[in-house]
């Protein structure tokens, strides 16, 4: 079964210039914050690092990908953020080397160290980006892919979806050993 999307899913309000390079990474940052809460580690996080890969890295500054992830990590919503507040938020991060994570707690954040532009591509998709949260006793990493139109996916979800489609196409799977066992009485293979 294919997922249906409406015109409201495709046409989004958000800061540009590119839904794949700006809105997608921003939404990925929001999802990462939710994961930190779900994992129960949000309040323990002392640092966040962002790795941009492939196309997001190569055109990231020109398409404001770096700004988008900072705004997303700051808890700003791309649909409702006052446009005139964006430059102030970014300037504050630059000047103080701190980020207000999820608009709830301040952590150290140095743009030059904590946003990494990797020239290599991740194998799954050209627009990959990874967030790593560091906290006392560990780290939590999550990789997202901006697939266009502001849509963001995780590789695990796509793989699970592909497996489900295969299962539907072949509802009665059979392996080689079972096939050999079934064909033995007739000696036909």
Which residues does each predicted region cover?
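A structural-propensity feature for long, helix-poor, extended segments
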Residues: 44-81, 93
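Short, hydrophobic/aliphatic alpha-helical segments
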Residues: 1-14, 50-52
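Short coil/turn connectors at secondary-structure junctions
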Residues: 4-8, 42-48, 66, 126-128, ...
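Single conserved hydrophobic/aromatic residue that forms the stacking wall/gate
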Residues: 180-189
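Hydrophobic alpha-helical hairpins/lids featuring a short glycine-rich hinge
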Residues: 93-166, 172
